[in-house]
């Protein structure tokens, strides 16, 4: 498994290899009291023997800040665009609010929903809106396309990772 972080130029990523983007709230450099959920996600992918690219939109040094780094949103957009699966895990809290995550979730749901997996813990803060939009968008698409569009909302990180790998394997058959 290749771990790709902000220090890796996104143009160096081989998107011909199975690629998963870990989307969700990011611990910022000014939040040293918080721990990134992505550490557990990386461990879960490793335990399941994932052998592709894992895009981790964070710095290797957790004290690093993205403040005034206007290249970071472009890096993330290119990573999201090139990935085969966008795994949204949203363990939202009052400290880890995920405002950019809200935008990304809506944008990619409208643009390429079929490559999204959506999960969040049952106790995540203020998730009702995203949950409702996820389900209502699936209903609308199902009606328009006359085909059932799945809309599971996973409630554990492990089940979200497994669903991402399942989607990735379907996509590459």
PLM region descriptions:
Residues 1-173:
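Conserved catalytic or regulatory cores that recognize and/or transform ribose-phosphate-containing ligands
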